[in-house]
Amino acid sequence: MEVYCLFMMRKKEKVITMTVTLILVVILICIKVTHFVIIERPLKQCRIVSAYHLTVNTNGAQIDQSWLFEKDDLTYIDIAKTFEQTYFVTDYAGGSSDSGALNELTIAFGETMDGMPDIRITVSENGYIQINGKRAYPLSLKYAGKRLYVHLLGCLQDGADLQQ
């Protein structure tokens, strides 16, 4: 009888351990899926619909490139969710390691009566995003700035490859 009780207790401990392990695995899978759906997937979407003016200045040579992004392409920038206008790139200042300048990409949202953008988001390669505009409080925040910067530059590069 004692042996049977010990056997049953060990079996019960194994069942509890397996249940706890299974619950932890399910939680980890849910976290990974949520991370992929909310963060990773939007970063991989990149559709360029039509051109706007963008000047890239590289060592004195100016290259005109410009692209209009569809609204859904940039909705993973939190503040962008409140705007219904199309987004367009207004400026890209390319820096080099020699000059110490930072690469910067500015995106404008909508346009006011005086031709100024409602909101400007500047993404720097140091990982900072600066947001300015009449309808937003100016702020600077450390975000997934590097990833966003690389993604947007990838969009521009994809567009340039498509045009050639």
Label every model-predicted segment.
Residues 1-13:
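N-terminal Lys/Arg-rich, disordered targeting/topogenic segments
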